[in-house]
């Protein structure tokens, strides 16, 4: 067996053994209470966002202020999508440290987006898509999937990070396989929704 392949195999076995040992140690403390708190907090956050979208009415005094926020939101979503793809690349190549940094960066971009999103909707309210016909149906379909999956993504992202930061790597890998595509889809469709609104704004 070639030496590089042998070394890589030993490294893989060492990582798997470490994950197993850590998993046994962490198994003594149930993650259910923390996951329960994450679900409750996520539910409260989603409830607030739904209120902001469909109940809150923006003041006309702020209608023309900070008009750059929608573009900033799309930019942050795009950066998040890039960071997610880079993180996937690194973990596929067994570079755990670079993967961790990339995913933390993606989380930072998503957090910044959420803050900017709340400020934008507080000041400006919801934006109505002016298009008609099939393009409106397409837009609403993308928007609906974006909103629904963003609701699902919030607790999943937090739970995935919790498992990683507490050393529960087996559970982290298991849930990350579901979290990643949802998070990536939400980030990409956030940009797509902005492009639709911008293209039909005039």
Language model region names:
Residues 6-7, 12-202:
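Alpha-helical membrane insertion/targeting regions
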């Amino acid at each position: 067996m070639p030496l590089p392949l042998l070394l890589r195999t030993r490294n893989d076995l060492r990582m798997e053994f470490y994950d197993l040992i850590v998993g046994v140690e962490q198994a003594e403390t149930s993650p259910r209470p923390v996951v329960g708190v994450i679900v409750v907090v996520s539910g409260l956050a989603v409830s607030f966002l739904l209120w902001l979208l469909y109940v809150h009415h923006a003041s006309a005094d702020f209608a023309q202020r900070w008009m750059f926020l929608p573009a900033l939101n799309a930019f942050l979503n795009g950066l998040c999508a890039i960071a997610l793809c880079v993180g996937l690349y690194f973990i596929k190549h067994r570079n755990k440290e670079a993967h961790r940094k990339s995913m933390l960066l993606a989380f930072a971009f998503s957090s910044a987006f959420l803050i900017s999103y709340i400020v934008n909707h507080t000041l400006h309210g919801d934006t109505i898509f002016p298009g008609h016909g099939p393009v409106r149906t397409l837009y609403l379909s993308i928007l609906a999937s974006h909103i629904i999956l963003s609701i699902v993504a919030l607790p999943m992202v937090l739970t995935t990070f919790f498992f990683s930061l507490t050393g529960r790597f087996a559970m982290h890998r298991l849930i990350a396989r579901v979290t990643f595509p949802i998070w990536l889809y939400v980030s990409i469709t956030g940009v797509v929704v902005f492009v639709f609104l911008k293209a039909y704004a005039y």
